[in-house]
Each structure stands twice: as structure tokens, then as C-alpha cells.
């Protein structure tokens, strides 16, 4: 599982380094160094403002998601189209080079507003990528919502 938050940078050409621990997890837990990068589900910050990062899916986990999406019962046509345009269509297969460097394509960098300072955030079977500025907004939103989530957290044993 992916855990932890790692701060790093991305250059103007979209090159960044996938944390070594996450590269190890890809191979040790998921059996493949390849992965897919795509847009994350936008976070509603209220007042018509949304924030978005990116998601890294381990290679096989992406195909599990695709199968689930294709067989998804209960999705309306509008929901299916929105998911297709937002998450499925922009997905790109990637792998890190021997030094751990990854190239994030321009269309994904633009959507996630990736600037110089970025974060890789472990999210169990996925990894989130956020610009520092967008992460700060989402975390502030999460902290406001957290008290109302305390019952759900307690049910998880925390």
C-alpha cells in the first residue's frame, strides 16, 4: 500500500521524480513498475470552486478500474460520459526511468495546476499528485469537514 506524503518539484518540461518508496511498492505489492497517470475526481471546495490533482494507478489496478467502469451498473449516460472525459480519456501509461524520473504530460499538468512545488500523497492502492497550492486548499477544506466526519472515523476504529 502507498502511504506517506513526499514533497518534490516538477520542472517546466513536466519532469519529476516518483519517490523511491512508491517505486518499490509498485514492484513489491503490485508486481509491475508501470502505472497510469490521470486526473483525479475534482474536489468541490464550495461556491463553484473546484480543485483537482492527479492519480497514479498501478498498472493492473487501472485495468480493474476500467473493467469496473465498463460493467458499472447504475451509472447514467451523463455520469458515464463525465467519467470518460475526466478520468479515462486523459489517462497515460508511464514508468519511471532508472533514476526514478517521470514525465507528466502537459494536458495533465495543466488540469492539476502543477507548478514547481508538488506533493506525492500515498492513498493506499493509488497515489495522488497535487500542486502545493491546490493541496493547501483541499486540506483546509478537509479540516473544516473533518468534525462532521468524526463518527465515520470512529467506526473505522480510530
Curated annotation (Swiss-Prot):
Subcellular location: Cytoplasm, Nucleoid
Gene Ontology MF terms: DNA-binding transcription factor activity; transcription cis-regulatory region binding
Boundaries of every SpoVT-AbrB domain copy: 5-50, 91-134
InterPro entries: MraZ (IPR003444), MraZ_C (IPR035644), MraZ_dom (IPR020603), MraZ_N (IPR035642), MraZ_sf (IPR038619), SpoVT-AbrB_dom (IPR007159), SpoVT-AbrB_sf (IPR037914)
GO cellular component: cytoplasm; nucleoid
GO biological process: negative regulation of DNA-templated transcription initiation
Primary localisation category: cytoplasm
Entry keyword set: Cytoplasm, DNA-binding, Repeat, Transcription, Transcription regulation
Subunit (UniProt): Forms oligomers.
Similarity comment text for this entry: Belongs to the MraZ family.
Protein name stated in the entry: Transcriptional regulator MraZ
Native source species: Geobacter metallireducens (strain ATCC 53774 / DSM 7210 / GS-15)
Source organism phylogeny: Bacteria, Pseudomonadati, Thermodesulfobacteriota, Desulfuromonadia, Geobacterales
Amino acid at each position: 500500500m502507498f502511504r506517506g506524503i513526499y514533497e518534490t518539484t516538477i520542472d517546466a518540461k513536466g519532469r519529476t521524480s516518483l519517490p523511491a518508496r512508491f517505486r518499490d511498492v509498485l514492484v513489491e505489492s503490485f508486481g509491475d513498475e508501470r502505472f497510469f497517470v490521470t486526473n483525479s475526481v475534482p474536489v468541490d471546495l464550495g461556491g463553484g470552486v473546484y480543485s483537482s490533482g492527479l492519480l497514479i494507478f498501478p498498472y493492473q489496478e487501472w485495468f480493474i478500474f476500467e473493467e469496473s467502469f465498463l460493467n458499472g451498473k447504475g451509472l447514467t449516460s451523463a455520469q458515464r460520459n463525465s467519467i470518460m472525459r475526466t478520468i479515462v480519456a486523459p489517462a497515460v501509461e508511464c514508468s519511471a526511468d532508472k533514476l526514478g524520473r517521470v514525465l507528466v504530460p502537459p494536458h495533465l499538468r495543466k488540469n492539476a495546476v502543477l507548478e514547481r512545488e508538488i506533493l506525492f500523497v500515498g492513498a493506499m492502492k493509488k497515489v495522488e499528485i497535487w500542486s502545493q497550492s491546490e493541496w493547501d486548499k483541499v486540506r483546509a477544506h478537509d479540516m473544516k469537514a473533518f468534525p462532521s466526519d468524526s463518527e465515520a472515523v470512529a467506526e473505522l476504529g480510530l
